[in-house]
């Protein structure tokens, strides 16, 4: 017991100064910046390793999407490089690994070996979510995950023991309804084992909601932080989360969104089995989403289209949000990129341009929004101005230990959100001497 507490204390001391944690995901790597843009980032978290990798006595090797050596060169030599395990929709490996003492010991040992093999400085456990309400909530109801409420803190305790003085962080939900394992009773058991708590104070409305609202407003982000403080979280361990993307939702055409765009009704945003029905989504702040189409576009010959491919689809074909040419609704409806092909009806790109031009600031809720009445779309996103308010009204006021963002590769058009966070740290949460 003494050894475990001592190791935990060492790790906590290593993150005591105000910090900036940044996720780097494998799906947005085209224009990742170098050191001249990443000043102030203390923790770079490569995402993701699959949760199932660590349950075997002879585990499969984890293969990072970029070599850790190359990734380290993008940041200051003092930046700690971590790896995140899990992510949205990847919970099965955690459920299996946490179920009993033997499975927890095996999982933790394998994680420790993986960190050593790749030279990582720590691990982030991105379990969305212990106790239920994950992507699989229709296939695996919460009633079948009740045991995870008790095993989750034990799982973290085993990891703490196994990785020694390396950094252990967790990504935790932003929506109160997802706090199934995060209660006054369980909170202290969870937080004692970890060095950082990355609060996903974004996606605060999602496709399970039925009215519009801010996905990451100042007020609802503050509400989330207060919920964690209420269940025993040490503010020095909390990192306030920021999202480098805008979200859009299809509104009910019979609702009064013109008069009351905040709180107006949405259409059903999920299929009956809980899967995405394409009536909501996200748009990142990277060149492929935000920049005008290059003038020298060629016709696609390999089925790829969009900014990165520098190609448009042949006549009559649509360019999907993921950058592929096709003619079905999957390519031509919601998310269709009108700069790179034909769209049938809704063009997310065109709607977003209107949102950027005519967006409105909700000073009370602390978020930017826009209602596109022509397409019945509601947009919600963060701006540098509201990021500054979050530093003043949440990070400074609540004496939080730091901030985090998802993800670096999603802000590569102008780096406005990254720069706003760097400025916020300078203004409201200076580094310790």
Q: Where do the protein language model's features map onto the residues?
A:
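A cross-domain feature marking catalytic cores of carbohydrate-active enzymes
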Residues: 24-26, 48, 83-87, 127-129, ...
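Structural recognition of alpha->loop->beta junctions
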Residues: 34-46, 100-123, 127-129, 184-204
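Conserved, mostly hydrophobic/aromatic
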Residues: 44, 83, 125, 197, ...
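Fungal secretory targeting signals
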Residues: 1-17
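Glycan-binding loop/region signatures in secreted carbohydrate-active enzymes
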Residues: 71, 85, 242-304, 335-393, ...
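Substrate-binding surface in catalytic domains of secreted glycosidases
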Residues: 53-66, 130-292
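Glycan-recognition patch characteristic of GH18 chitinases/ENGases
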Residues: 17-115, 213-214, 339-349, 370, ...
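Secreted, short cysteine-rich peptides and small extracellular cysteine-rich domains stabilized by multiple disulfide
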Residues: 301-344
């Amino acid at each position: 017991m003494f050894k475990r507490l001592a190791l935990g204390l060492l790790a906590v001391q290593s993150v005591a100064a105000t910090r900036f944690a940044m996720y780097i995901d494998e799906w947005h790597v085209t224009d990742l910046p170098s050191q001249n843009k990443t000043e102030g980032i203390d923790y770079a978290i490569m995402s993701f390793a699959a949760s199932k990798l660590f349950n075997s006595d002879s585990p499969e090797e984890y293969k990072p999407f970029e070599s850790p050596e190359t990734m380290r060169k993008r940041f200051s030599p003092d930046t700690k490089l971590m790896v995140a395990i899990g992510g949205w929709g990847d919970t099965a490996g955690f459920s299996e690994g946490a179920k009993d003492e033997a499975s927890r010991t095996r999982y933790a040992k394998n994680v420790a070996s993986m960190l050593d093999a790749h030279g990582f400085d720590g691990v982030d456990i991105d379990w969305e979510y212990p106790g239920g309400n994950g992507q699989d909530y229709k296939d695996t109801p919460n009633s079948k995950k009740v045991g995870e409420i008790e095993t989750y803190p034990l799982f973290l305790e085993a990891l703490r023991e196994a990785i020694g003085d390396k950094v252990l962080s967790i990504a935790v939900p932003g929506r109160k309804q997802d706090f199934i394992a995060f209660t006054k009773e369980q909170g202290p058991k969870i937080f004692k084992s970890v060095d950082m708590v990355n609060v996903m104070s974004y996606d605060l409305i999602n496709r399970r909601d039925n009215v519009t609202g801010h996905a990451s407003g100042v007020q609802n982000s503050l509400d989330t932080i207060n919920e964690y403080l209420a269940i025993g979280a040490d503010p020095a361990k909390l990192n306030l989360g920021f999202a480098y993307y805008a979200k859009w939702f299809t509104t009910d055409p019979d609702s009064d969104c013109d008069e009351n765009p905040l709180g107006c009704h949405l259409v059903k945003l999920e299929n009956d089995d809980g899967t995405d029905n394409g009536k909501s989504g996200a748009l990142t702040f990277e060149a492929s989403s935000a920049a005008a189409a290059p003038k020298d576009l060629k016709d696609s010959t390999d089925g790829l289209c969009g900014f990165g491919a520098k190609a448009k689809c042949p006549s009559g074909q649509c360019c999907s949000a993921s950058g592929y040419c096709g003619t079905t609704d999957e390519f031509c409806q919601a998310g269709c990129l009108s700069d790179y092909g034909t769209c049938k009806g809704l063009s997310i790109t065109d709607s977003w341009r209107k949102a950027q031009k005519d967006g409105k600031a909700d000073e009370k809720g602390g978020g930017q929004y826009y209602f596109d009445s022509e397409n019945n779309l509601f947009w919600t996103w963060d701006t540098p101005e509201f990021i500054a308010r979050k530093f003043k009204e949440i990070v400074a006021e609540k004496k939080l230990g730091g901030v985090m963002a998802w993800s670096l590769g999603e802000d590569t058009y102008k780096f406005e959100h990254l720069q706003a966070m760097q400025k916020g740290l300078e203004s409201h949460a200076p580094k310790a001497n």
